[in-house]
Amino acid sequence: MSMTRRDFVKTSFAGLPLYAALAGKIDSTVNGVRLGTITYSFRELPRTPGALDAVDVDIKALTECGIGEIELFSPDLQPRLPREDLRKWRLSTPMEHFKALRKKFEDAGIALFAYTVNFRNDFTDDELEKSFEQAKALGASIIAASTQLSVARRLVPFAERHKVYVAMHGHSNVQDPDEFSGPESFSRALAMSKYFRINLDVGHFTAANFDAVTFIRDNHDNITHLHLKDRKKNDGPNMPWGEGETPIKQVLLLLKERKYPIRAFVEYEYRGTGTPIDEVKRCMSYMRRALA
């Protein structure tokens, strides 16, 4: 039986059993709005010497920040290898490896809401298949993808076979018709598959001169989660939160007032004065104050 978008909201966004089970461990929900981060925010933190991934570093950082729900950035799970060696790693690493990583996060009280895979044209079909298998092994029902419309078409049979949702992440490049940036590009993706959704980057959307508040209000059933950053309009720079033109507070209040089950995740990209942990803490505090 096919699942409608409204059914998807009720089942996935309202809280899958895993998320509900973990809610009492690290709870980063404020007045009904579920806050978190993409682990890309911690990309500058050094890995543990000898480690092939950044999982332990991520867990320590998330615990310090009091974050209980995340989008897991796939490069954090991978050894740093040349492209062809990384392809071999993707194809040969057993799913038990990813299940073990999932358990590490679960044991730390952190729920994996989404898994980032930035699909590119050079991904083979075997790599696409493995990416969806990895998401399932990690317990993530959503893959968040920075990709292109031309690549999205290739993802349709994989998403539908695995019943894993792919949430398209946009940027501010409105000149390239193959890039996700504005409402029209997202509409084209949604028309491709019932398993396609939107991971709206509120900062990039604002920098591309679109109205994030109106878009969320009109499309909330199709939005899985938000990436929050504070950019200026006209493709302007990333700024410390509160110094740009992105309506972060208004977006958060919309989620709170309308009770939309859309996650709000920090994506730390501006040039901060502290460590990534310091800056993510500042962003989390900003959101908590906005929702108080």
Question: What do these predicted ranges mean?
Answer:
Residues 159-245, 249-252:
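Acidic/histidine-rich catalytic cores of soluble enzymes
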Residues 2-142, 160-167, 172, 221, ...:
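N-terminal pre-domain/capping segments
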